[in-house]
A protein has these predicted regions:
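Core catalytic region of metal-dependent phosphoesterases/phosphodiesterases
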Residues: 15, 23-25, 30-123
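Generic detector of leucine side chains in alpha-helical contexts
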Residues: 12-13, 53, 70, 85-88, ...
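A short linear-motif detector with a strong N-terminal bias
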Residues: 1-4, 46-48, 72-74, 108-109, ...
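Acidic, histidine-bearing metal-coordination/catalytic regions of metal-dependent phosphoesterases
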Residues: 1-44, 186-236
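Conserved beta-sheet core of the metallophosphoesterase superfamily
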Residues: 110-222, 228
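Short hydrophobic "helix-edge" motifs at membrane interfaces and signal-peptide entry regions
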Residues: 16-18, 87, 143-145
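A short, conserved beta-to-alpha structural element at the edge of catalytic cores
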Residues: 1, 45-60, 90-107, 179-213
Length: 236
């Protein structure tokens, strides 16, 4: 364990954002060729994609920063994983995604600060669930401004929703994401930190805080509008 442990309570998973920069990301899919077509990533091949993802990462993350990667780190074996990890800045915590499971017993997993199926952390006084998948519901979500957050990946959502492509027998077919219709049911305190949703770059704790605050404000406005509409209907 490195110097970063000074800012990390191992038992309670508490971090102090005034002493260390904290970032979140997910679904980098290093060396995964099909992900370029599936998610319409703007890269010609995996070499170009991997270089961009690593450069974007290191443009915001310094060697002493903390990064929580919420799964589906890379596609491939030890050569791919070790090469990518040797180039990335920061102390990385890995939440396992569905594509990471086969790598659990590999030696390069020790290069992460910690590896887990999920984590529950505090940054300052903010409680945060970290998972690869979005939750339908979770403890602490109904506390208003003090609600716990849940950060996730997996769904490859994008700020400007697009249709995804699937490859079947060499043919490319346009379809809607199987997860897309469900994302509207997320709480305003949930956010997809995956690279496809964040300009292929890790997002900082401060950025996530700003995004979730904005989502909460929108949610509040929508509820107030619904209540006004409901009142108007009842008077007719």
């Amino acid at each position: 364990m490195s110097e970063v442990s000074r800012y990390f309570d191992k038992q309670l998973l508490k971090f102090d954002s005034s002493k260390v920069n904290i970032f979140f990301t997910s679904d980098t899919h290093i060396a995964h060729e099909n992900i370029i077509k599936y998610c319409k990533r703007p890269y010609a091949n995996t070499k170009e994609m991997d270089e961009a993802l690593i450069n974007n990462w290191n443009s915001v993350v310094s060697p002493d920063d903390i990064v929580f990667h919420l799964g589906d780190f890379a596609w491939g074996g030890s050569g791919v994983w070790n090469d990518a990890l040797s180039k990335l800045n920061g102390h990385i915590y890995l939440i396992l995604g569905n594509h990471d499971m086969k790598n659990l017993r590999q030696g390069y997993m020790t290069r992460f600060e910690a590896v887990a199926f999920q984590m529950y952390i505090y940054i300052d006084k903010q409680a945060i669930y970290l998972n690869h998948y979005p939750f339908l519901c979770y403890a602490g979500v109904y506390r208003g401004e003090n609600s716990a957050w849940q950060l996730f990946g997996h769904v490859h959502s994008q700020k400007k929703e697009i249709s995804y492509e699937t490859i079947t027998n060499g043919e490319v077919k346009e379809i809607l994401s199987k997860d897309e219709s469900r994302l509207k049911y997320l709480f305003p305190t949930q956010y997809d930190v995956g690279v496809d949703n964040n300009n292929y770059t890790p997002v900082s704790y401060e950025q996530v805080k700003e995004i979730i605050t904005y989502q909460q404000e929108l949610y509040k406005m929508e509820k107030e509008k619904e209540n006004e509409t409901s009142k108007g209907s009842s008077l007719q």
